[in-house]
Regions:
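Alpha-helical transmembrane bundles and membrane-interface segments of multipass inner-membrane proteins
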Residues: 1-139
């Protein structure tokens, strides 16, 4: 069982670290409306999202943060009952993504704890702007 959870921990750590590094980079390089075009419709553009998926529910950050914590607890508890390595890795991805965005909500703010905005930066121009954490949750 412990060996299986090592995979979860690796997935979780990779998501949180990559997510926070890319968000730090975006805040440093994409301020003032700067857009970096990469390929075809892919570009990097800084967006601050105080809502949840697709910017819905803006302004309800503290409520969403509490709900996210409850979902994390549920996913971890559910994942603890699974024996499949792929399911345990998926739990690591989902929890890592949730924690990555929760870090933003908690600490990327000037208005108070849990009132921050999630930093999004990956813009395909035909889909809402996302970040590594959200991509990990969806995968």
């Amino acid at each position: 069982m412990i060996r299986r959870w090592k995979y979860c921990l690796v997935a979780f750590t990779l998501v949180v670290v990559c997510d926070q590094i890319t968000k730090w980079w975006a805040l440093e390089k994409l301020e003032n409306g700067r857009v970096i075009e990469i390929f075809w419709t892919l570009q990097f553009r800084l967006v601050r999202n105080t809502g949840i998926a697709f910017s819905q529910g803006e302004g309800f950050g503290p409520i969403f943060s509490i709900l996210i914590l409850l979902v994390i607890l549920f996913v971890v508890r559910w994942g603890a009952q699974m024996y499949s390595k792929s399911v345990v890795v998926a739990v690591g991805l989902v929890v890592g993504g949730a924690i990555g965005n929760l870090i933003d909500r908690a600490f990327r703010t000037d208005t108070g704890f849990l009132k921050g905005a999630v930093v999004d930066l990956i813009d395909l121009q035909w889909w809402p702007v996302v970040d590594i954490a959200e991509a990990a949750i969806v995968v």
